[in-house]
Amino acid sequence: NLHSVFYHGTVEWRCFESTLHAGEVRADITLALAVSAQAINLEKTVARKTPVGDNPAFAFRTFLLRLGLIGPEYKNVRMHLLKRLPGDPAWLRDRNQYESYQRRHTRGDAR
């Protein structure tokens, strides 16, 4: 909302749905803070659209990692933000297409 920027010097985030679930509220606040911190700390940006591809969950997970939401302290945040997206957040394509995954599971050496 640019009105609040010009008159109050603040930023408003109006893109989150109302919820009373504490984990979802924390995830939304953490996402807003991470995006704001990245916007403040970047020296330059390039405005171009990046295709999401066939797996939006993987694309959003890598975006969250670029924001710095890495580690066990952000595991719950990532879980809440990714739970409604289609696709596998851990694999870009179907995991059965990867040779290393197939070798591990054909030997019976599942981890």
Annotate the PLM regions.
Residues 1-111:
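C-terminal accessory/tail domains of diverse enzymes
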